Amino acid sequence: MFSKLSTRGIATRIGYLAQKAASQETAAPAAGSLSETVFARENKYGAHNYHPLPVALSKGEGVFVWDVEGKRYFDYLSAYSAVNQGHCHPKIVKALTEQASKLALTSRAFYSDVLGEYEEYVTKLFGFDKVLPMNTGVEGGETACKLARKWGYLQKKIPENQAKIIFARNNFWGRTLSAVSASNDPSSYEGFGPFMPGFELIEYDNVTALEEALKDPNVCAFMVEPIQGERGVVVPSDGYLKKVRELCSKNNVLWIADEVQTGLARTGKLLAVNYEDVQPDILILGKALSGGLYPVSAVLCNDPVMLCIKPGEHGSTYGGNPLGCRVAMAALEVLQEEKLAENAFKMGELLRSELSTLPKDVVSVVRGKGLLNAIVINEKYDAWKVCLKLKENGLLAKPTHGDIIRFAPPLVIMNPRLRESIEIIKKTILSM
């Protein structure tokens, strides 16, 4: 196992930055254009912690977004799977505007007439006793880790300050100090130490490594993504999640499923863990929980875990606010009413089938589930340049880890639009 407190070399980081800088050339917009003005203002007044594709968006509807010059694009990123229901879904917008005009925020110092309704709805939908409402995915991850540690001390009787949480290498769950402490990606952790103690890493999709790690009596939890999204849509072997469930139960260890990106119909099931018919001890949801209209996340588990947390030990000013709760219920209703999991499954099969016909000397790998997919580009073609060309042709996607391009359109995309977007991808790849 690899601990985040071990020494890490700077050489990896330098090599990473050099490679990134060399590959990320930006196609300049027309001089004096409105887009150029937008880029310049952000560059002047904003932190330089992102390297966006050079497009300035001003409108979204369904599977499309428009830039400030009025050009329309297919959105094949979906805000990292936050916009599963499509941009500005009318039902979710209606829920937001109606609740915003009544009551938006109370804090948890008082009850509201919406929170309990939401809590009942979401716990019954996913089959848990309790939910702890938060705002962002990374807050959900932090909450899950706190719950696991608290349970470890109170229920498993781990000695004070000795609890360990195991993570899979190449995970991604955010940018807080806890999240980067669980990362082995230099671009996430370099320069931010010292790191969180009690976090250890094992290989993803490696049952033997997990079995060995869980023998440690001080391990309280194993946190893992059912599919590693940010890594480039890495799908584990069939049966991996069943073994995770089996080993965690055998060793009295909590299984935390990070479904912030994979959950809520994205992979063709309501949850990605549903493919193996298993339930985690702690479930983290976020992103599409609000349909992209408001930051909402949730941590679900049963009473023996959730009731370890007492008043004053965890909370959030905005978590569980009436506006977020109303939006989340509408977003979840859309997933079910429009059968978006079923659509994601069917459209994903078609998308991967068509992508698999692309020349292997350009696209070496096609992988994914539902509408969470990725292609691996031969290094000599440069994935960043491919994305710039896709943009020119009317489709927005973003590379990850150098040679991987994620394809994850909103789940409302139907056959004709999907085929139209596939033609853009084919045209682009064949022109490289």
From Swiss-Prot:
Location of this chain's protein in the cell: Mitochondrion matrix
Which SUPFAM superfamilies does the UniProt record give?
PLP-dependent transferases
Please list the reactions this protein catalyses: a 2-oxocarboxylate + L-ornithine = L-glutamate 5-semialdehyde + an L-alpha-amino acid
EC class of the enzyme, as a word: transferase
Q: Does the keyword Zinc apply?
A: no
Keyword field:
Aminotransferase, Mitochondrion, Pyridoxal phosphate, Transferase, Transit peptide
Name any cofactors this protein relies on.
pyridoxal 5'-phosphate
Instruction: List N6-(pyridoxal phosphate)lysine occurrences by residue.
Output: 287
Which Pfam families would you find in this protein's record? Aminotran_3
Q: Which domain of life is it from?
A: Eukaryota
Q: Which GO terms describe its biological process?
A: arginine catabolic process to glutamate; arginine catabolic process to proline via ornithine; L-proline biosynthetic process
Q: Which Gene3D superfamilies does the protein's record reference? A: Aspartate Aminotransferase, domain 1, Type I PLP-dependent aspartate aminotransferase-like (Major domain)
* Pathway connected to this protein: Amino-acid biosynthesis; L-proline biosynthesis; L-glutamate 5-semialdehyde from L-ornithine: step 1/1
CC annotations in GO: mitochondrial matrix
Enzyme Commission numbers on file: 2.6.1.13
Per its UniProt record, what NCBIfam families does this chain match?
A: Orn_aminotrans
Family (UniProt) = Belongs to the class-III pyridoxal-phosphate-dependent aminotransferase family.
Q: Which PANTHER family match?
A: AMINOTRANSFERASE CLASS III, ORNITHINE AMINOTRANSFERASE, MITOCHONDRIAL
According to the record's subunit comment, the protein's assembly and interactions are: Homotetramer.
Record's protein name: Ornithine aminotransferase, mitochondrial
- Encoding gene (name): Oat
